[in-house]
Curated annotation (Swiss-Prot):
Keywords: Cytoplasm, NAD, Oxidoreductase. PANTHER family: GLYCEROL-3-PHOSPHATE DEHYDROGENASE, GLYCEROL-3-PHOSPHATE DEHYDROGENASE [NAD(+)] GPDHC1, CYTOSOLIC. Belongs to the NAD-dependent glycerol-3-phosphate dehydrogenase family. This is Probable glycerol-3-phosphate dehydrogenase [NAD(+)] 1, cytosolic. GO terms for molecular function: glycerol-3-phosphate dehydrogenase (NAD+) activity; NAD binding. Substrate binds at residues 190, 341-342. GO terms for biological process: carbohydrate metabolic process; glycerol-3-phosphate catabolic process; glycerol-3-phosphate metabolic process. NAD(+) binds at residues 42-47, 190, 229, 341, 369. Its EC number is 1.1.1.8. It catalyses: sn-glycerol 3-phosphate + NAD(+) = dihydroxyacetone phosphate + NADH + H(+). Its main location: cytoplasm. May be involved in cell redox homeostasis.
Length: 456
């Protein structure tokens, strides 16, 4: 098979690509001439890159697969962004030539001059994600009508923020009422909802999707890993895990795997999905610490030790034998604390360039999912019905009382009663236990609360 040159200059040889596509088509019962239809829902940075990776790998097999992405229509591109986009276009000869060849360059000139308004769905068709202007993608097939996008899709990729997942999939369920075949859904969303009545419990994005659509949980998977979207599209080496039922996770891991993007499979959906939400929580604090200490490696490592011990403690509340915080799971946490929109947000707060009053949707960055997750985790873990034995004091306390960093973040971001500088006090508290003690306490299994996931 002849290799193909991509818009970003990379070459994708055969590498069994068509064979992997054929294998997945057979598993999904697709006959000759029947397209395998894949659609991404939501066009944030990672959702757009994920669709672009599939388009680069499989898009040339037009008689076998159709790859599209849905985003809402009507989002305009402001003048400042249009000017920056024009600079990006002219700095990349390959992109410039592509737009000229597609007769699409002139509209960017007009937008640069203020003579035309561009729209997010329009520029996405040309390969520009509004949340990631500096990293041009391949051109994408964009759909703005949700019903058209999903009604006959075989594989749906949820690229929505967790805060929007339930609402959009409830709408999608209306278009699936008469479906005969059940779609496969891959969720990229990181975050949770907290339900406090009738009993406190966590609701993850895959649970939201199953509840909204009636799609069985065995057909819903979660993909996560140490992934910075722009770096992955620029072919930086990365890996990820796709978690869920054995029926789908192994063939999908094989289908998604590329030379620079290695995908493994794992059965522990709960731990990976909860960790996906938790890491965004603690990434905001990591950004604050980095900015407040002038990028002190020592301070950041102290924060890392304490926040990972809290994460381990929380996952042991949720599942009796959670996946260990190691390998890709640890790497995902590390890279999110090191770099990403949540860490960036924490830095901007600490520098005074943003404030919590500005909300959780930031221009040029999209949704800061860690903010809502801070509120959800803290409010859930503050419920008296979940009380656990304090390791040193002879009394029952809510689990949140054993998570001092989470508590500080809640008071800074949600209650807004502390300044960002107070995050450092959580590290300097002389009464704080050694992180190892919190981990040992969690691993004793004394705190496992199956009700948090709706289990008896």
């Amino acid at each position: 098979m002849v290799g193909s040159v991509h818009v970003n200059g990379s070459v994708n040889g055969g590498n069994g690509t068509e064979e992997r596509l054929d294998e997945l088509r057979r598993l999904l019962g697709k006959s000759d001439g029947d397209l395998l239809k894949i659609v991404g829902i939501g066009a944030g940075a990672w959702g757009s890159v994920f669709a672009a990776l599939l388009q680069d790998a499989y898009g040339r097999f037009r008689e076998k697969v159709q790859i599209r992405i849905w985003r809402r229509a009507g989002r305009s591109v402001d003048r400042t962004t249009a000017e920056h986009l024009f600079e990006v276009i002219n700095s990349r000869e390959d992109v410039l030539r592509r737009l000229i060849r597609r007769c699409a360059y002139l509209k960017y000139v007009e937008a640069r001059l203020g003579d035309r308004t561009l729209y997010a769905d329009e520029i996405l068709r040309d390969g520009f994600c509004l949340n990631m202007i500096d990293t041009p993608l391949c051109p994408l097939k964009v759909v703005t009508n949700l019903q058209e996008a999903v009604w006959d899709a075989d594989i749906v990729v949820n690229g929505l923020p967790s805060t929007e997942t339930r609402e959009v999939f409830e709408e999608i369920s209306k278009y699936w009422k008469e479906r005969i075949s059940v779609p496969v859904i891959i969720s990229l969303a990181k975050g949770i909802e907290a339900s406090l009545d009738p009993i406190p419990r966590i609701i993850t994005p895959t649970q939201m999707i199953s509840s909204a659509t009636g799609v069985p949980t065995e057909n819903i998977l979660y993909l996560g890993g140490p992934n910075i979207a722009s770096e992955i599209y620029n072919k930086e080496y990365a890996n990820a895990r796709i978690c869920g039922s054995n029926k789908w996770r192994k063939p999908l891991a094989k289908f998604l795997r590329q030379p620079h993007f290695i995908v493994w499979d794992n059965s522990d959906l709960v731990t990976h999905e909860v960790m996906g939400g938790l890491k965004n929580v603690y990434a905001i604090g990591a950004g604050m610490v980095a900015a407040l200490t002038n990028e002190s490696a020592t301070s950041k490592s102290v924060y890392f030790a304490h926040c990972t011990s809290e994460m381990i403690f929380i996952t042991h509340l949720l599942t009796e034998q959670p996946e260990k915080l190691a390998g890709p799971l640890l790497a995902d946490t590390y890279v999110t604390l090191l770099k990403g929109r949540n860490a960036w947000y924490g830095q901007m707060l600490a520098k005074g360039e943003l404030s919590p009053d500005m909300g959780d949707s930031i221009k040029g960055k999209g949704m800061i999912q860690g903010i809502s997750a801070v509120g959800a985790f803290f409010e859930l873990l503050s419920q008296p019905s979940l009380s656990v034995q304090h390791p040193e004091e002879n009394k029952q306390v809510a689990p949140a009382e054993l998570c001092p960093i989470l508590k500080r973040l809640y008071r800074i971001l949600i209650k807004r009663e502390l300044s960002t500088r107070d995050i450092l006090q959580a590290l300097r508290d002389e009464t704080m236990n050694d992180p190892r003690e919190r981990i040992e306490m969690a691993q004793s299994h004394a705190f496992y609360r199956p009700s948090l996931l709706g289990k008896p």
